[in-house]
């Protein structure tokens, strides 16, 4: 392809709305343009990268025995009402009515549609096991689209579903998909962790996320270098110190005028934050919940939601009027002792192992010290509701945990019979008995994978594409297109590489060499061939985008050299 004919309107300035490298570079390198908040148009280079990633996904899914289909993006409400998810998704699902006032949605995910297909078409054990997948645009009305395609309202996803006769079969399908995902992300040139995760609104269990380590990732990951344990923040656990050596002391009320936060208490009492227990008052649907965690910890609301069995939008911190009603005190002095009315107390599993901690007294300007669980108060539920922190002990081996940020690019989990029960997807076994089909679900965000690749493969000059997903493998840059010898050699190399089936660009624009080099670096094409002054000596330069140094190569050797580089890097 000739660069003079390619729609590639690169930008010199950083777009105002772009916050992270992938968003900045996808706009600067003309991979995409913004149409609306969270909605993007892909230009030719961006579309080529998307197709490269999709091709890798297709090859590995097919290799794993999966079959590609294509479902409708428009889903009738009846299907989601059968599963109970029409209301579960809440405002993030795009809902609409047709001209006959029938309810539909733009698919945020497709469990029900796949299950509906299978309940109608699969009747016998002879038709199982089965894995189906599609690559299709999904829609979610994100409250706050940000970071470009990292959190957008329209995105391309590969979603696959396995259908098995029993749990043993699901285990085999799950492992096939796990291995396929590892191959996909390896081929995309990504460094990633596979972490334990929460299934969220999708349901199911044995949930794993494929996380690309990146400082701009929205997910927090806890992992252990010693044993390989890894989990996202919503699922991460740690060992609790079981050894209690401190004797219980008599509890004592302490005057703490206008001292409301943990930080203020630390300064006022001169005690470290891990000796405090904070009581957070929540409104959970129509109930009030007091959730207790150690003073230096954050409460994990996903863990709390799972315990309560409610949706995210049904949980919120209580307002001042509710806090004052159940505690009898102003905000900032809540504690577990003497709460008024029907309040469900949920205590983090670390607290029963603490001694002589400090809590709010449920009296304005007062706290209580030397409080102990069991003696002074009890909970309705004791469970893990905290976020782990750096240095916590690994739940498997006891080594210190590390904390990092990651971008979720893939998610696999075992659905079991959640949807087959709800929609009646059954098969008849060898004995003639009717049984529910056992399902698994497997997703990859295609756009997000592209962004994650850029996050891990860029420098101050631009993108550094891995060979496997680069829009073109080679860019030829004649330094001076007006120079007949340079132009002729550049065109000859261009034709020779095309003949070999190599994806090649030629920068035939009549621009300064510096501008061309800058664009080549910005676009991230893996191999640059510079045709310059040494062309009369039969020499050109080959430079890899990932390296600083260029190598002089005989013109007669260029094609073979390029073929070898591509073979090595693919």
Curated annotation (Swiss-Prot):
EC number(s) on record? 6.1.1.15
Q: Which GO terms describe its cellular component?
A: cytosol
**Coiled-coil intervals, chain numbering:** none
Task: Provide a Gene Ontology MF annotation, just one.
Answer: transferase activity
Indicate the enzyme's highest-level EC class.
Answer: ligase
Report the InterPro entries cross-referenced here.
Answer: aa-tRNA-synt_IIb (IPR002314), aa-tRNA-synth_II (IPR006195), aa-tRNA-synth_II/BPL/LPL (IPR045864), Anticodon-bd (IPR004154), Anticodon-bd_dom_sf (IPR036621), Pro-tRNA-ligase_IIa (IPR002316), Pro-tRNA-synth_IIa_bac-type (IPR004500), Pro-tRNA-Synthase_IIa_type1 (IPR023717)
Where does it mainly reside? Answer: cytoplasm
Does the entry feature the keyword Coiled coil, yes or no? no
Q: Does the keyword Protein biosynthesis apply?
A: yes
Keywords (alphabetical) are: Aminoacyl-tRNA synthetase, ATP-binding, Cytoplasm, Ligase, Nucleotide-binding, Protein biosynthesis
Tell me where it resides: Cytoplasm
Q: Which Pfam families match?
A: HGTP_anticodon (PF03129), tRNA-synt_2b (PF00587), tRNA_edit (PF04073)
Please give the catalytic activity noted in the UniProt record.
tRNA(Pro) + L-proline + ATP = L-prolyl-tRNA(Pro) + AMP + diphosphate
GO biological process terms held by the UniProt record: prolyl-tRNA aminoacylation
- Transmembrane stretches in the record are none
Describe the function of this protein: Catalyzes the attachment of proline to tRNA(Pro) in a two-step reaction: proline is first activated by ATP to form Pro-AMP and then transferred to the acceptor end of tRNA(Pro). As ProRS can inadvertently accommodate and process non-cognate amino acids such as alanine and cysteine, to avoid such errors it has two additional distinct editing activities against alanine. One activity is designated as 'pretransfer' editing and involves the tRNA(Pro)-independent hydrolysis of activated Ala-AMP.
HAMAP family per the record?
Answer: Pro_tRNA_synth_type1
Relay the domain remarks.
Consists of three domains: the N-terminal catalytic domain, the editing domain and the C-terminal anticodon-binding domain.
Family, per entry: Belongs to the class-II aminoacyl-tRNA synthetase family. ProS type 1 subfamily.
Assembly: Homodimer.
Q: What is this protein called?
A: Proline--tRNA ligase
Taxonomic source organism? Thermoanaerobacter pseudethanolicus (strain ATCC 33223 / 39E) (Clostridium thermohydrosulfuricum)
């Amino acid at each position: 392809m000739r660069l003079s004919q390619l729609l590639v309107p690169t930008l010199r300035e950083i777009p105002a709305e772009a916050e992270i490298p992938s968003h900045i570079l996808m706009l600067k390198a003309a991979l995409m343009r913004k149409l609306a908040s969270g909605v993007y148009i892909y230009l030719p280079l961006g579309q080529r990268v998307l197709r490269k990633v999709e091709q890798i996904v297709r090859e590995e899914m097919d290799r794993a025995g999966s079959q590609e289909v294509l479902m409708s993006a428009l889903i009738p409400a009846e299907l989601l009402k059968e599963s109970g998810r029409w209301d579960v998704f809440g405002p993030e699902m795009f809902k609409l009515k047709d001209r006959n006032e029938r309810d539909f949605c733009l698919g945020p995910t497709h469990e029900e549609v796949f299950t509906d297909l299978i309940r109608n078409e699969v009747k016998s054990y002879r038709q199982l096991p089965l894995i189906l997948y599609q690559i299709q645009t999904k829609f979610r009305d994100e409250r706050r689209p940000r970071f470009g395609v990292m959190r957008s309202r329209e995105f391309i996803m590969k979603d696959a579903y396995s259908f098995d006769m029993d749990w043993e079969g699901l285990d085999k399908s799950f492992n096939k998909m796990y291995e396929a995902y590892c191959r996909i992300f390896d081929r995309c040139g990504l460094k990633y962790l596979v972490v334990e995760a929460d299934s969220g609104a999708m349901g199911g269990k044995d949930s794993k996320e494929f996380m690309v380590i990146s400082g701009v990732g929205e997910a927090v990951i806890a992992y252990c270098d010693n044993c390989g344990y890894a989990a996202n923040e919503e699922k991460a656990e740690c060992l609790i110190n079981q050894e209690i050596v401190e004797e219980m002391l008599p509890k004592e009320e302490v005057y703490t005028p206008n001292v409301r936060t943990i930080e203020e208490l630390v300064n006022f009492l001169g005690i470290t934050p891990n000796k405090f227990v904070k009581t957070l008052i929540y409104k959970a649907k129509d109930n009030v919940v007091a959730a207790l965690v150690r003073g230096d910890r954050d409460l994990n609301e996903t863990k709390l939601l799972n315990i309560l069995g409610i949706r995210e939008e049904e949980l919120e911190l209580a307002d001042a009027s509710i806090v004052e009603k159940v505690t009898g005190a102003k905000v900032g002095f809540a504690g577990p002792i003497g709460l008024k009315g029907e309040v469900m107390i949920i205590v983090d599993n670390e607290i029963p192992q603490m001694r002589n901690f400090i809590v709010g007294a449920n009296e304005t300007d007062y706290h209580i010290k030397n409080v102990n669980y069991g003696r002074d108060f009890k909970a309705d539920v004791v469970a893990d509701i905290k976020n782990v922190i750096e240095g916590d002990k690994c739940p498997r081996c006891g080594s210190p945990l590390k904390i990092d940020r990651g971008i979720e690019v893939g998610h696999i989990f075992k659905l079991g019979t959640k949807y087959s029960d709800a929609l009646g997807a059954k098969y008849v076994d060898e004995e003639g008995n009717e049984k529910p089909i056992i399902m698994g679900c497997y997703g990859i965000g295609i756009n997000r994978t592209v962004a994650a690749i850029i996050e891990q493969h860029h420098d101050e000059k631009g993108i550094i594409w891995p060979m496997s997903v680069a829009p073109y493998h080679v860019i030829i840059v004649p330094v001076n297109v007006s120079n007949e010898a340079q132009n002729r050699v550049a065109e000859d190399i261009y034709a020779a590489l095309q003949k070999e089936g190599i994806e090649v660009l030629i920068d035939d624009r009549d621009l300064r060499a510096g501008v061309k080099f800058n664009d080549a670096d910005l676009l991230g094409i893996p191999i640059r061939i510079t045709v310059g002054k040494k062309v009369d000596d039969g020499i050109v330069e080959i430079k890899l985008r990932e390296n600083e140094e260029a190598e002089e190569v005989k013109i007669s050797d260029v094609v073979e050299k390029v073929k070898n580089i591509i073979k090595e890097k693919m």
